[in-house]
Design a protein with these regions (language model features):
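Ordered alpha/beta subdomains of enzyme catalytic regions
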Residues: 1-155
Length: 155
């Protein structure tokens, strides 16, 4: 992967196809802008082999906020999605949905409530709560989790 591809893949496209296809479904159904809440949590403390941690430390919030600031669908991201095909060779994302991503998608439309960095956190208790448009929350979910999960693991 060259630098250009890495830059594209680490931006708003740091997600999976499921999140994008669900967002497109919400868009088609006309519910993409209803307010929704997403709770981010982890299920168990790290198991280091020789001992299992009794808690974790929240980390990665600054990185997550930086990532959110850069989460935009520009020309490169739209062209990448425009070239996505189904197994039958049909385009996966419609032009009107791609136009919405380019013109109207904004990670700034969400409210993020988070446990402060450095605080003790526990399994099954929300670390972040995202409130905002359903499709936006769906699209940014994987990127946010990928951004903070490793940092929490090593903190």
């Amino acid at each position: 992967m060259n630098f250009h591809e890495l830059k594209t893949a680490s931006g708003v496209l740091l997600t999976d196809q499921y999140q994008l296809t669900m967002a497109q479904l919400y868009y088609r159904m006309g519910i993409h802008e209803i307010t929704a809440q997403f709770d981010h949590f982890y299920r168990s403390n790290p198991d280091y082999g020789f001992h299992q941690s009794g808690y974790s430390i929240n980390a990665g919030l600054d990185t997550a906020l930086d990532w959110l600031d850069q989460a935009v669908f520009g020309k490169e991201e739209i062209n990448f999605l425009k070239n996505h095909k189904t197994a039958m060779g049909k385009r996966l994302f419609s032009d009107d949905f791609l136009k919405w991503l380019r013109d109207d998608f904004s990670a700034k439309a969400i409210n993020l409530y988070a446990v402060p960095e450095g605080r003790v956190i526990h399994p099954n208790v929300p670390i972040h709560v995202i409130e905002g448009p359903l499709a936006v929350g769906q699209i940014i979910e994987t990127g946010l989790l990928n951004t903070v999960n490793y940092q929490i693991l090593i903190a």
